[in-house]
Amino acid sequence: MKLIESRQLAKLPWLMHAFSTRGGGVSRVYGGNALNLGFTKHDFRGAVERNRVLFLKTLDVVSGRKSWPLITLRQIHSDLIHCVDRPSEKLLVGDGLITNTPGLLIAVQAADCLPVIVVDRKRRAIGVFHAGWRGTAKRIVEKGVGEMRKHFGSDPRNMLAAIGPGIQSCCYEVGGEVRTKFESQFAYAASLFRELKESDPVREKYPLLFLTARAPGHSELPVKMFLDLVEANRRQLLDTGLAEKSIDASAPCTSCNRDILFSFRGDKGVTGRLLGVAGIRPN
């Protein structure tokens, strides 16, 4: 089983963190031997539960029959963030978790959306956030840092962040409504989008035919638009006060690396979920 870690976060001896990958599990769907860690409609619940046990053992948070509690969410692409100090009897609804309690694993699921881990290295507090385009537009990560400041007295100057595997600007095509939403929220929104005109073999072969004004009823070539979700979240972290060198955004693109990662878009909606997890080691 392969895990992805942030080199920067790995330097903190009291911190446990990881982003899971696609292989090394028992799920027969999603290509087989899949480490699907989300209760998706295509997989058996028992397989997911077994995958989670294998994952926790790999993280070395299992001792005998006891393991660290794993706290997850029913994610709804929101800006709802929960501060937890123990497992909840009911599945919490939202897209962010924060804690300063040792011996708990907090986690978010993803399969193109970004799993983001934020760590206060001085006060030993942590947060995990699920940032798709909707959550990013709602400033989930920015608000998460704010919640850590409120609950734990965290100072962004003492914080580190790791943006985990997610779909990147090379592959993340979006519609005009997404750009409109971002432009209503961020002054720098234009820098987050890349436009690409679709190719037209006829135009490319006979360019002189298209030098004159286009005939009535004929439109310009359609434009594809791509969003840099990683940069959008990196900018939010910078705006909260984190130093540029404190943000690790080196994780791979899920859509480009479907052999090792789950991608909702790349797998056409039939895929598993990875986890971004963090925990504080007990003294």
What are these regions (language model features)?
Residues 1-283:
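Active-site microenvironment for binding and transforming phosphate-containing groups
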